[in-house]
Regions:
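A short, small-residue-rich loop immediately preceding and capping a beta-strand
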Residues: 84-122
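ATP/NTP phosphate-donor binding region
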Residues: 1-91
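Fold-independent oxyanion-binding glycine-rich loops
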Residues: 18-19, 41-43, 95-97, 118-121, ...
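Short glycine-/acidic-enriched loop or helix-start segments at secondary-structure transitions
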Residues: 49-51, 103-105, 127-128, 162
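Active-site segments that bind and position negatively charged phosphate/pyrophosphate groups
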Residues: 195-241
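A glycine/threonine-rich phosphate-anchoring loop and its flanking beta-alpha core
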Residues: 12, 110-207
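Alpha-helical scaffold segments in soluble metabolic enzymes
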Residues: 23-27, 52, 79, 106, ...
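Structural signal for hydrophobic packing residues in well-ordered secondary-structure cores
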Residues: 28, 32, 57, 174-182, ...
Length: 241
């Protein structure tokens, strides 16, 4: 008797490319999120992206609340939640690198609010996936949370991010090749559930990025495009695993 079931949650909209940052309010409207946004960011992403997003909402007559965090901690998550309880937003928009995205994702999940991911760097596949990494002391916790309802990645902003963040994103993708092998071994030796679809997608994404390695250079939007699309694919693989 077949009794297997799964519930796969994926972003509804993924908007990537040149000068798409101003499209955030339209993307929010398209996924039917209502109410004013709480924009979660950190100091540098605030200057390069979040202020512009807040202004875009203001042009539509929507007053966004903004909270600037310094690091990804459970204390930062609580601070975002406290600000949300005071502001009563309809959604959370995370604008920044992996740390900001993770904090906003966990806070949105805890509050039951829709979350929109706006990465300013292509540093890891958490910009799309349903997991967040939050450190506590010497321990880094991997926390399950709903994936973003939408992702908006401006390749101009991402291309201008520090190069080491982009290379970290590349390493995150390429490491999937060995991660899948470990997963397959655990399946054979320990009976760990293995998803052929997720494994195949992860391996394909890693192989495609390696094949295009010569096209990835600092400061190029085309390079940011390649890496971000690969991170999206990797994040989707995590969600269907």
């Amino acid at each position: 008797m077949f009794e297997k079931s799964t519930w796969i949650k994926l972003p509804r909209n993924v908007v990537l490319g040149h000068d798409v940052l101003d499209d955030v309010p339209a993307v929010v409207e398209d996924v039917h999120l209502r109410g004013a946004p709480l924009v979660v960011t950190s100091p540098t992403p605030d200057e390069v992206a979040a202020q512009r997003i807040v202004a875009s909402f203001a042009e539509r007559g929507v007053e966004a609340t903004k909270v600037v965090i310094e690091e990804a901690t459970f204390a930062a998550v609580q601070r975002v939640m406290d600000r949300a309880e005071a502001a009563d937003p309809g959604l959370i928009v995370g604008v920044g690198g992996g740390k900001v995205i993770d904090v906003a994702k966990v806070a949105g999940d805890e509050l039951g609010l829709g979350f929109v991911s706006v990465p300013t760097a292509a540093s890891h596949d958490g910009i799309v996936s349903g997991r967040a990494s939050v450190p506590e002391g010497d321990t880094r916790h991997s926390v399950a949370a709903d994936p973003p309802l939408a992702v908006v990645g401006d390749t101009g902003v991402i291309a201008d991010a520090p190069w080491e963040l982009t290379t970290a994103g590349c390493a995150d993708i390429i490491s999937n090749a060995t991660a899948v092998k470990d997963w397959q071994l655990a399946h054979r030796l320990k009976g760990v559930t293995y998803s052929e679809y997720a494994g195949a997608l992860s391996e394909m994404t890693a192989e495609m990025l390696v094949d295009r390695a010569s096209d990835i250079h600092p400061g190029l939007e085309e390079s940011a495009w390649l890496v971000v699309k690969a991170l999206v694919s990797s994040g989707v693989a995590m969600s269907i695993a």
